[in-house]
Amino acid sequence: MSEVPDSYDPDEAEQKWRDEWLESDVYSYDGDEERPDYIIDTPPPYPTGNLHIGNALGWCYMDYAARYHRLQGDDVLFPQGWDCHGLPTEVKVEENRDIHRTDVSREQFREWCVEHTDEQIAAMKETMRTLGFSQDWDHEFRTMDDSYWQETQRSFLQMADSDYVYQDEHPVNWCPRCETAIADAEVENEDREGTLYYITFSGADNDDIEIATTRPELLPACVAIAVDPDDDRFEGRVGDRFEVPIFGQEVELIADDDVDGDFGTGAVMICTFGDKQDVDWWAEHDLDLRPVVTEDGHLNERAGEFEGRSIDEAKDEIATALSKSGHLHKEEPTEQSVGCCWRCDTPIEILSKEQWFVKVDQEEILETAQDIAWYPDHMYERLEEWTEGMEWDWVISRQRVFATPIPAWECADCGHIELADESEVPVDPTNDEPAVGSCPECGSDDWVGETDVMDTWMDSSISPLYVAGWPDETFEPVQLREQGHDIIRTWAFYTILRTAAVTDEIPWEEALINGMVFGDDGNKMSKSRGNFVQPEEVVEEHSADAFRQAMALGGQPGSDIQFQWKEVTSASRFQTKLWNITKFASEHIDESTPDIEAPAYRDADEWILARCARVADEVADDMDEYRFDSALRTVREFVWHDLADDYLELIKGRLYEGRPGERKAAEHALFVSLSASLRMLSPFAPFITEEAWSHLPADGSVHNAAWPDPPAGDEAAEERGELIAEVAATIRGWKSDEGKPLNADLERVEVYIDEDRPLDTYDLADTVNGPVYIEEGTPSVELVPVGVDIEHSELGPVFRDKAGEVVGRLESADPAELQAELDTDGHVEFEVDGETVTVEPEMFDIVEEQRAESGEEVVVLEADDATVLVFE
């Protein structure tokens, strides 16, 4: 055992143990068939280079679970993946190099994206190590590596073989800024201020009609006008034809139950496409397709003189033209929900494009999800709500570069689509030829490789398969997925869909969901509000362990939590307390302490060990259910109050002056309870617990130790020890309140309990600094009047010049007689200078003292299960 420094230096300790853990493979997954697996499907984060506090919360939760399960003897696989592909990296590379991706070859652009991603990953890995996360870095993976997108392509091919994947032309969400299709889950609706335009359509052979729209720029794409069939304003007009102003095409008035008659004029134009409702009407009524918006968000040749205008430019110019032509009746402000790209916040368009899709089997997804244990369980309802609201299949093709290639070729002569064979993957169709050679339909060997790539969620949605060794290993559900509630509709949804489609299994046994992290002021974190906190900032000012504890105590998993600096400060104070306990313990235990045989425990020892065993069970129950906040509070309460405040105070006398057997018993119980505490705390505060553990007679790392299993002890002895601790704490509290030194001597202490039972007063007497006697029953104590306390502000103004004499008469009177007169008459009367004066009760108080049956003055204290008489 090495000497424990007087104070704990987190900077030094954290750097030391980060290096030691990495060098010693403390967190390696062994693949031990004798132990149960605990595999975590870690979310591969997008490598932004910045592990923000929201990311850190999720990784804290995963790390708490990983460390706890190692203590439980499980073979833990805590991998680290990186979700590398995607538009943000492409945009950043374009900005950094001042290029457009089409300015260079696909290979060169991808190479630059990889270089940028590597730099970002390195920065995030350093933050993860700083925070003490215990990943097995031998199981790190990157979705941009060939070995990963090989399996992404393999799963794509297997799903295509099972008819989950298909190619078709269909209206899709399209981001004109990103110039790619995006899935429903990547569209976020925002409430924005817009304008409602009232536009007149001239009747072909009938009266005009007025429609209301927020998108006059889509007039060249108008294919019909729709009204509610029950709207009397349009009775007899269904089937009439009208000319679209400025652009001239004729459209028909149709009836549909989905038209909202209360919106605008009750008549709406149907365009291809303004929104999903337009798509539904277009399909249901077999309308023409008149696309007018280009992939980059401009109008095409159908817009005539407005061709080439951006959407916003076209809106303004067409509205102006309508006003000049007399077709624009009025404009009014309106609130509208606008679907926007979640990456760049650009309003999406709906374009009809040939794309690759994955079928969404809502029933299969929900049935699979029901077999997963959700923490908290109401998070399943979020998945259910999203799934039931799905209207379209998942469009998985993207018109980008930095992503997993879709393994397909098109025959240049006959249009046949050829998918790669599983033996070919990984494959890049823009560089590689299909193994089939000639086209099986026409015999041509002229192939055009698919340039579209896969949605990045196609990568990350196979993460549980990849970490579990699929396809080399038969897939079995991993134990845990931890993720934020904001990506239930994406990562959770897609993973359940894909795993069920490929393996007919659930992806994970348990799904643990975390919420968002708000600032100390309760608002969403932002630099403009001044409440933004980076994890590194907390570590630098306090420590990684303090940050980790604050994350655990912020709230229950699933709920949004508030980052609070006071929790960080409290954690730092607790760590100081823990270090002081370790320092004290190290002065009394040695290498032989753990091996003491049959220690002669006293009641206090039995009590602390029983409490420790109970706490270990409670904390384990909480950890099993991912109640990290409750688990940490329970163990901190035990360490601070039971172990430090109560037990250490009780045994100090034995440790310093006790006989060898008594001292050894206290040393052993102290070692057992402290070493157990360090193990229970280690998932939350890995650095200080490892440093403290290294100063105890314990083997290896605390993180590879076993979950504590202290002897439960004798129940009766535990109850006696509990009472001893209560009495000691009660007397200690009284001394503190009275400003007395805690080591102040007492003449004696009498403890009255309900039943006659032996109580070990050895430690208690040492602690309270006086002999302790145990009595059965209720003490005989009475309040005895011993004096008066004059209320001069009440008495003086009434008696004025006689006040002094009245005070003298009160102070010289027998307090007991004064009390009796008050009880009888409600006041006191005196003769002063031949005059009777009446002294009201508010003019003085009777001072009473507690007296024991012996007549001695005594202090009466109430403990939970005893009445304590203190004789000074």
UniProtKB/Swiss-Prot annotation:
Compartment annotation: Cytoplasm
Keyword set includes Aminoacyl-tRNA synthetase: yes
BP term (GO), one: valyl-tRNA aminoacylation
Residue numbers covered by motif 'KMSKS' region: 524-528
GO cellular component: cytosol
Enzyme Commission numbers on file: 6.1.1.9
Keyword vocabulary terms for this entry: Aminoacyl-tRNA synthetase, ATP-binding, Cytoplasm, Ligase, Nucleotide-binding, Protein biosynthesis
Entry GO MF terms: aminoacyl-tRNA deacylase activity; ATP binding; valine-tRNA ligase activity
Catalysed reactions, semicolon-separated: tRNA(Val) + L-valine + ATP = L-valyl-tRNA(Val) + AMP + diphosphate
Domain of life of the organism encoding this protein: Archaea
InterPro entries named among the record's database cross-references: aa-tRNA-synth_I_CS (IPR001412), aa-tRNA-synth_Ia (IPR002300), Anticodon_Ia_Val (IPR033705), M/V/L/I-tRNA-synth_anticd-bd (IPR013155), Rossmann-like_a/b/a_fold (IPR014729), tRNAsynth_Ia_anticodon-bd (IPR009080), Val/Leu/Ile-tRNA-synth_edit (IPR009008), Valine-tRNA_ligase_type_2 (IPR022874)
CDD domains tied to this protein: Anticodon_Ia_Val (cd07962), ValRS_core (cd00817)
Residues reported to bind ATP: K527
Residue ranges of the motif 'HIGH' region: 45-55
Family assignment from sequence similarity: Belongs to the class-I aminoacyl-tRNA synthetase family. ValS type 2 subfamily.
Function: Catalyzes the attachment of valine to tRNA(Val). As ValRS can inadvertently accommodate and process structurally similar amino acids such as threonine, to avoid such errors, it has a 'posttransfer' editing activity that hydrolyzes mischarged Thr-tRNA(Val) in a tRNA-dependent manner.
Domains as described in the record: ValRS has two distinct active sites: one for aminoacylation and one for editing. The misactivated threonine is translocated from the active site to the editing site.
Protein name: Valine--tRNA ligase
Organism: Natronomonas pharaonis (strain ATCC 35678 / DSM 2160 / CIP 103997 / JCM 8858 / NBRC 14720 / NCIMB 2260 / Gabara)
